[in-house]
Amino acid sequence: MDAANLVMKSSMFSKSPCPVFGSKLIPRAPPSVFTLPSTFRPLVKCIQASFPQNPDSKIPSNNSTFTCSAVTSFPSQQSQPHATSDAKLQLLISEFQSLVEPMDRVKRLLHYSTLIPSMDASLKTPENRVLGCTTQVWLHVSFDEAENRMKFVADSDSDITKGFCACLVSLLDGATPDEVLALKTEDLNALNVAGLNGKGSASRANTWHNVLVSMQKRTRALVAEREGRPRNELFPSLVITADGIQPQGSYAEAQARFLFPDESRVQELASLLKEKKIGVVAHFYMDPEVQGVLTAAQKLWPHIHISDSLVMADKAVSMAKAGCEYISVLGVDFMSENVRAILDLAGFPEVGVYRMSDERIGCSLADAAASPAYLDYLKTASTSSPSLHVVYINTSLETKAYSHELVPTITCTSSNVVQTILQAFAEVPDLEVLYGPDTYMGSNIAELFTQMSTMTDEEISEIHPLHNRSSIKSLLPRLHYFQDGTCIVHHLFGHEVVENINEMYGDAFLTAHFEVPGEMFSLAMEAKKRGMGVVGSTSNILDFIKERVEEALNRNVDEHLQFVLGTESGMITAIVAAVGKLLGSADTSSGGAKVSVEIVFPVSSESVTRTSTGSSLDQNKVNIIPGVASGEGCSLHGGCASCPYMKMNSLSSLLRVCQSLPHGKAELSAYEAGRFSLQTPNGKQIADVGCEPVLHMRHFQATKRLPEQLINQILQRSSSA
């Protein structure tokens, strides 16, 4: 039947007109067929409605019904040659906001899904899939050279999602590239079309944003091609499937070579550890060769652990209790210092603790906190009362000890820093919180709280039950953070990298550590709002990736997931292991869906070797840093997404230490983590005072409340001030 003569029966009926598609209601008796001008693509609906008697009405009811047809037209580009995308958007917003009932909006969306034809099967390819939608969505984009306008074709296996696509196509099909790129995802916030409070409504709303982002990414690519401009180069990446991994780019290839280590080296290390009763605690951020060997050796010797810095000392104590006589620490110096101090406090002073280099293994963040500027920051702020110092766990015991004597101090990790600060504000009235040393994390926390101040009380209570919009607004001027502390790794995620992500990976899943610079943080926060990102710790990032993979497997359709890894690349081993396990457990042998996962490393054009001329390195006489710039701006033992300090923990150093024990202790004196003999200004042992902020944090993690001892310290210091 010709579209202009189509008659459809439906229960959908609205008293308001359809401004975008030109709806009008035509009352009539029996159904009939209308013929419209060729410039319209109409949809005629027959509606039969029965009106129940209003008990308050004085008009008697005759239980009558009436029937009418709604003619909804979809103007062609010729009929509205000057209509801008913005004007169309305002009409669309007005239309949906005029529908009070949520179900009416859903029905209108279903109605729009009938206005666009199904996409040709040849275009429903994996390359045309839109990520982040709970259903399958395809998008094909082309450029009309003659008219200098964009053309969009979209489809979905869900009628509701297809309705979303129809609305976006109606806005942007035939628009200029500038119009397409000017539309912002927040411009679509007023289009709460689904309007359902049930499970999945948020993911439906995210469809607007994810399809728009894909439209814009592909528009940029076509415009660049048309203008003859070279596009930004793709970042190196690693593709994980049930059959294995496929490296992309020289950097990812280098990483992959060590994900499956030499079995002879694995056997050699495991035998040494077992023979000499050596435990190993290692941080995520280290050389991939070492991670690969250690991960494989865990199957042969259980006393090997790879984690964030917080857990390393705890695991060392467990290993000592299990009979280990030595602990090798693969990390920076403050981590080995923490292990040494915690073992002493736990009653294991005889257990030796060894670093992996006879040179200093520094940390730019820890160095910043040990600077005179940081102590001056605390001294100035400590005049405010009451005050609490929240210090990042990745600092030395000296920093924790000296800080704690100036201002009551609690340590934090990127996983618990937000909850720690919010709980402190909730428990201590008029509290001033001083965070340090990482400037990026501090600014990101402040930005997060600023965003929270615009949320509803219900949304805020989901983050922390003791806060609301009023309390969040009141704490903002009482939150302070150090201005001169930078992690050299996360500093590299700057404007250039963010620009490349926007152009090349805007429709991918984005992950960001709390410490990354504000631009990368904001980008990930925006993606998080539409279900496409996560901001948090390394563990949060890993959990997010695993959840998205599980969802894809449950959908049981062929799918390619792409994640931008906005943190140090050393955690790729943990990601490969977790994702590989999930994909391997899926049954694809009987024709099941095939899911692949791509991990993208956003590598800056700046190399970390630039920091060799920086003050933090020169002051500490670190003359040789593994990993000079090469290839794509990074190399196996360093580079823009790898910490040069962590890469000093080489496999050869680990084997050398293990081989020298126990008889070569004298040769390893420079490797041994020494005990603190210095005292604080108040005459106390650094290890005793420095461990107290860590114990405060452990109490908070166990109880979700600040320890009473810490609160008393805050109030007593306030009274004395």
Swiss-Prot record:
**From the Swiss-Prot or TrEMBL record, what is one GO molecular function term?**
4 iron, 4 sulfur cluster binding
Residues binding [4Fe-4S] cluster are C363, C487, C643
A GO biological process this protein is involved in?
'de novo' NAD biosynthetic process from L-aspartate
EC primary class: transferase
User: Any binding details for the cofactor?
Assistant: Binds 1 [4Fe-4S] cluster per subunit.
InterPro entries in UniProt: Fe-S_metab-assoc_dom (IPR003808), NadA (IPR003473), NadA_sf (IPR036094)
Cofactors named for this entry: [4Fe-4S] cluster
- Where along this sequence does the record place binding of iminosuccinate? H283, S309, Y392, I393, N394, S414, H513, F514, E515, T538
Pathway this chain belongs to: Alkaloid biosynthesis; nicotine biosynthesis; Cofactor biosynthesis; NAD(+) biosynthesis; quinolinate from iminoaspartate: step 1/1
EC assignment: the record states 2.5.1.72
What residues form the catalytic site here? Answer: C133
GO CC, any one term: chloroplast
Q: Where in the cell is it found?
A: Plastid, Chloroplast
Q: Which residues are the transit peptide here?
A: 1-67
Task: Report which reactions are catalysed by this protein.
Answer: iminosuccinate + dihydroxyacetone phosphate = quinolinate + phosphate + 2 H2O + H(+)
KW Iron (keyword) present = yes
Q: Write the record's keywords in alphabetical order, separated by commas.
A: 4Fe-4S, Alkaloid metabolism, Chloroplast, Iron, Iron-sulfur, Metal-binding, Plastid, Pyridine nucleotide biosynthesis, Transferase, Transit peptide
Q: Which domain of life is it from?
A: Eukaryota
Protein purpose? Involved in the biosynthesis of pyridine alkaloid natural products, leading mainly to the production of anabasine, anatabine, nicotine and nornicotine, effective deterrents against herbivores with antiparasitic and pesticide properties (neurotoxins); nornicotine serves as the precursor in the synthesis of the carcinogen compound N'-nitrosonornicotine (NNN). Catalyzes the condensation of iminoaspartate with dihydroxyacetone phosphate to form quinolinate.
Q: Which PANTHER family match?
A: QUINOLINATE SYNTHASE, CHLOROPLASTIC (PTHR30573:SF0), QUINOLINATE SYNTHETASE A (PTHR30573)
Q: Which family does it belong to?
A: Belongs to the quinolinate synthase family. Type 1 subfamily.
Q: How does it assemble?
A: Homodimer.
Report what the protein is called.
Quinolinate synthase, chloroplastic
**Which organism is this protein's natural source?**
Nicotiana tabacum (Common tobacco)
